[in-house]
Amino acid sequence: MVALMDKIAQLFRNKQYSDLIQLIDKQLHAKNEPEALIFLYAIQGEISFKQKDWIQAFAAYEKAVAESKQKGLPTQVYAQIVQRQMIILLRLQMLDTAFGLFSENQSVSVDNVQVLAQLALLYLMCERYSEAEKLLSSIVESSTSNTITLSKQFKEDIGPFKELFGVLDTYDTFLATILNNLAICNSKLGNHTLAFDQFQQALDIIKDPEKITRPPLSPITVLFDNCVSTVDEDKEKALKVEHHMLTINESKENQEDDTVLSLLRDGCTLIPSSTLGTHLPLIIELHSTICYNIGKLELTLGNLDRSVNHFKKSIEYQPSFARYVALGLVYRDMRNFYDAAEMLTKAVDSCVGISNLCLGEVVYNLGILVSEELKMPYKSLQFFDEATVLFIRGEFSAGAILSRIMKANSLTTITTATAVSSDWEFIMAFLNTLYLDLCAFSKDQGFNVEAAFTGTNAISFNLPITEPQEKESPKSDKIASEKPLVESNPGRSRTPSSMNDVYMLSAENLSFSLLESSFAQKETITSRLFPTFQAETKRYLAILYTNLGLIYYRIGIPTYYKQARRCFEVAIWFDNDCVFAINYLSVLLLKENSKTLAIEGLLKCTRLFPEYYEPFYNLGNILKADEENKKALQYYSRAIELNPRFLDGYLARGVLYAELHRFETAYLDFSKCIELDPDNRHAFCNYIHMKQILGIFHNDTLDMRKISKIIDDYIHEYLTVQNAINKGVVLPSHPLPPIMPYHCYLYRLSSSQLRFICQRYSEQNVNWVKQNIDMMSTPLLDLSIHQRPMPPSIGLINSVSSSSQLQLSMLPLNQSAADSMVPLAMLTPGPTLCTAIGFQSIKSVIRDSQHITHGPIFSYDRALITLARSKHSSKCPISYIDIVNLKSPLRLGVLCDDINSIPIGCILESWLRNIDPKVASLSIYSTVASDKSALRTSLEAHCSNFIDFTNYKYQNNPFLCAQRINGDGICIMISMCQHNCGLEGRILAMRPAPIQISYWTHGGTTNSNYLDYILADQYCIPPGYAHLYSEHVITMPGCFICPSHSMHYSNAILLEEHADILKVTVEEVRSLIQDSKPDIDVNHHSAAGENILSLDGSDATSSSVDSGIGSRTHSEAPIGGGDKDEGAHSSKILELELELAEIAKMKGETKNGVSTNSASEGRDELLMNDRILITGDNVFFQVQPIRNGRLVGGRDRSMIKKMEPLLKAIYPLQRIASEAAVPASMEKSENNSDLTSHRVCLELPLYRKNIRALYGIPANCFLFCTFNQVYKFDMGTLGIIAALLRSVPNAYYALLKFPPASQLHIEAFFRHKAPDILDRVIFLSMLPMKVEHIRRYLAVDVFVDTLKCNGSTIVLDALWSGVPVVGFVGEYILSRKTLSFLSVLECKDLICASQGEAVLLCTRLAVDSGYYFSVRKRILKNRSNLFNISRWCDNFVLTMMLAYKNWIFGGKPTSFSTERVIANVKSQGFSWPLKSTGAQ
């Protein structure tokens, strides 16, 4: 008998089951003892159990139990047989029978404790946690009180059954297992603290096993290449399957009954079993399993770090599929994606015994992780292929289709980057096949998509999606009324935050672990896809269609938007609450100008699923476009709150913060973007720009190199795409460069890189016009009312107007899309040139606008003169002026995107006041809304044709804006906009005017074909630099910038203050300035007086005309006192009489017979005819000086509040001392005891030392300054500051808090690099009043400009104040403006070739007083060369006429110099006056 049992055990050990079955059958027919029969039946049941022959196994075990009644079985063996029977009944879904294995109301005793442990396990599997906890607690109590007896029971010899069941439990392992299961029960019941204690007790009972040395984890790159081994034949079958029936006849080994498994989803516990293989110690598996379960409990409580530690320890004891997956999912939740991918790859490599569905889902999650998070779409393809095969093996077609869709997404990403023709053909065919397969699969599920959509227009999400486009763009009132911060929907336990998260495995899919060899080990990872598909088939199909539609949309080709929309509509048809489909469909509706529907759809998303972040982001974009910035920030922040890793949300919010000048906050958002994706180009470039604005200069060199590398990579990608497009491949449009054209001049890029960036933006504008031109249907305008100004008829126009250069034939309206971009141009119906616009026929008015090659400056006046003389005899020569003058004023237009700013606004105001309207009329087109400032109000009042394109009539629509410009008959459009691909660029790309000129604001070339000229001077763009510009260069006389200082700040700094600085008399200063008296046409300034900012109350216009710019006449005494004894008494007293009580009652009333309405009509109460302000950081209020009587014109009590700080600010002036006393007092009116009237007296001038006292600057120091914005700084600028302060002992350096947040960063830089000079760096606040800013230059000795971007108005302010400016020179206009200013002032010696040379020059100015004073005198003497508005405007109008004449006579754009044209004409004996219409 012993020999027989040994033979049977050997066959069982060697898994020779066939021979063993034959032997058992033979022995069962023989006569055997009861002990032998029990063993034979147990062996027969074990073999059937391993072969999953459940009925045969249960029958064998039943016979073994029956035989045991005659011959008793050891307790451990009986417990194992009962466990097997329980497992079989669970497999057969016979729960009641399983519970029948145990006697009812059986009390716990030493004899039945092991069997009752199986009953407790059954309670756990059925989620009857309270009953399981009660029974397990009794087992623990009984076990601990009968330790000796139980120990003997576990040491009982079980004979041959030891070979059958392996190593059985000891008392310690049994008790540790019971405690583990009891801890699981308490965890499920919410007693987490007790559960932790019981887990720890279980670990304390069993001794810590000796650690096993294991090989380290393989590198991630190796793991990706060697992950899942799949037969190539299976892959080929999967790829060739047609439509939805993705089936394959594979072996179903390891395939479990999913219905039974659902009963065990969270009841996975330790089974008190001895089935552990003999090759591993039982103690190791117990430790590993308990550590895993502790990690699961920590994960449930949200302690990710602790969970990772326990999972790692579990894997260290005994690695397994479930433990690798658990650790990988935790790493993914911690955003440690590389480690997560490594763990999931390890899990796939250890997938022995795992079902195809479970393994396929893990591989699918690995593919999503690699594609979306690691940004390695090429690597993800193998995972999606493998997942497809596994789902096919598991007969889960819906999972296979989802995996194929995600593969298509990865292929699209790869193909977009490579732009290979064959790849695009493949992906398009693959997507079409996917769509057909998905439709067929839907049909098999009972949903005929094609039939449902035949004859229907769209599927609504409770909204009329197919509603026609609205004519007017809707406002965002509905969004503003919504509250973005809403509570989560309590009806759903887990709402996905993104579409990829819908069916991804998570911590919820992890269960407490069983022993490694247990039947239910695979259920430690519960499936998510298959149960969801079974429970919510329509919702699952909606997600499939949404994923497919999103791929079509992300391709970026407009022709595929229709297919994307169809997919989204089908998804909504399946699930009307599919927020993902509604969100993306709303985005498409925005592209189709269905704004109202889009907003309603997005708002529905926020109501259905408040945890979904993308609708909040899209609503934020809409609000931002509508300039609802505060609300947009709320929606962006809500999106980021819902998804803290939402890079686009941080990027959009950072851009908006930057536009709102909240630079520190923007910097933090861009820093977060870099943290999330260090390779994101747009995020990095915005991050670097914020660093420059804030003065953060660490790693500056590396940053510039990286930006250059980014642009090089971008150029390479763009050229690759363009080559493919040129070969006929249909590709999505390549995105714009990550740097704005204006900013690219700040990053030390090469000339070719700069030109390429600008060209891309220009191309984008042109392409936008091409794509959208057919959408408009505006009728033609009446030709008769849009005539251009023309020269007198001299027999020349008729021949020119009929020439081939201007005669434009009408082309068919349905011109192909391949035609070149069509500008708005001039039609030539007759001798008088006219224009017409009709968007249906714009393509028929193409004008040849190609630029000729740049060459030497060409003066075309000789050709004009020749043409004129050829038509007349020598006896009656024609004067050149007849050719120049027009029958009506030249119509100039200015397109401006920053008209509210002081520099541009002041320039335009000076044009309006100094250009003779009889010679040229000026129209202003603003693309920014009014800020209600006095400057904007003045411009709108004085410009006869001021158009605000933000008005509802134009809706920021480029077509409507271009139509208005063209309809106004503008001859020359002057662009004062930064080069962009927004509204301004699109307007210019349509060529609403025949001549378009770039002026000043961009700072370099636009590299476009729709801007003909760039306005410059001989210093900004000398002939040797013309090749850097695509535009033709118009060289103006003098400086190309028009400084308006002489009009706006006539005598902001008084003669006495100049004399004090130069240490000369007032008469010498007056003589110095009067020597440079310009030749000014007084008529041009007839209306300028009311806008001049004067300190003494005099009329600044007459002052500048009669006695030189900046001087003051003897005839006009300042307010508050005469000028009778000017040599002895140089101070001027300004008296301000303020009616603090009565002023509020004067609205519409009269006082002392004087009407108040006429004085204040149409003007700001605080901005009267003459203006005065008091110097000091705390005084920002403008007050009208009183000549006669009391102040009138106040309108409400708010004016009183504005006056109060002014009065209070007078008191600090009492502490300012000067050689002549500077009294400041507030005197109470003797006749008014109730303080209703006050008189304020302030002595002027204040002189340098008093100005310095106000700003906290040492009185006797030598003050350098750089008042440019900090983004213009670089490391060289900071190096100059440090070098100057070290080389000049008594020097201080003043910087502006421009922006305020930059101060901390610059101070930190000097504290680290040059702490010895930090206390001599002074930071001054920005002043809201320009005159006060100019007066602050009284405290400055030398202004040091910046190299990479020169200052503009800030440098002109310094020069107007007489402060020497040390400048640099670069390549483009942006870095050559200071050269132009100083050259006109005959101060070229202040231009430096290097920063080292600048330090030497500045040092010389500081130590050589003779040289310093000579420079200041030279600036004052020559400043009329730079600041003469009248002369500049005359030259400007003349230049515009020359450009227009060139076009009139059929000439193509060509570079020319106005000065040389005039000189050439005069050399021919012709005169050159400008005649107005009336003079002819």
Curated annotation (Swiss-Prot):
Catalytic reaction equation(s): L-seryl-[protein] + UDP-N-acetyl-alpha-D-glucosamine = 3-O-(N-acetyl-beta-D-glucosaminyl)-L-seryl-[protein] + UDP + H(+); L-threonyl-[protein] + UDP-N-acetyl-alpha-D-glucosamine = 3-O-(N-acetyl-beta-D-glucosaminyl)-L-threonyl-[protein] + UDP + H(+)
TPR repeats: 38-71, 113-146, 176-209, 288-321, 613-646, 648-680
GO-annotated molecular function: protein O-acetylglucosaminyltransferase activity
Compositionally skewed regions (Polar residues) per UniProt: 1099-1112
E.C. numbers: 2.4.1.255
Sites where the protein binds UDP: Q1269, K1272, H1333, I1334, R1335, R1336, G1351, S1352, T1353, D1357
Chief location category: cytoplasm
InterPro entries for the chain: OGT, OGT/SEC/SPY_C, TPR-like_helical_dom_sf, TPR_rpt
Assigned GO CC terms: cytoplasm; nucleus
Gene3D superfamilies (alphabetical): 3.30.720.150, 3.40.50.11380, Glycogen Phosphorylase B, Tetratricopeptide repeat domain
Annotated stretches, region: Disordered: 468-497, 1093-1128
Pathway, per record: Protein modification; protein glycosylation
Basic and acidic residues composition bias: residue spans: 468-485
Record localization: Cytoplasm; Nucleus
GO BP term, pick one: protein O-linked glycosylation
Keyword terms of this UniProt record: Cytoplasm, Glycosyltransferase, Nucleus, Repeat, TPR repeat, Transferase
Major enzyme class: transferase
Origin superkingdom: Eukaryota
UniProt record similarity statement: Belongs to the glycosyltransferase 41 family. O-GlcNAc transferase subfamily.
PANTHER family per UniProt: UDP-N-ACETYLGLUCOSAMINE--PEPTIDE N-ACETYLGLUCOSAMINYLTRANSFERASE 110 KDA SUBUNIT
Free-text comment about domains: The TPR repeat domain is required for substrate binding and oligomerization.
Entry function: Catalyzes the transfer of a single N-acetylglucosamine from UDP-GlcNAc to a serine or threonine residue in cytoplasmic and nuclear proteins resulting in their modification with a beta-linked N-acetylglucosamine (O-GlcNAc).
The protein, known as: UDP-N-acetylglucosamine--peptide N-acetylglucosaminyltransferase
Organism: Giardia intestinalis (strain ATCC 50803 / WB clone C6)
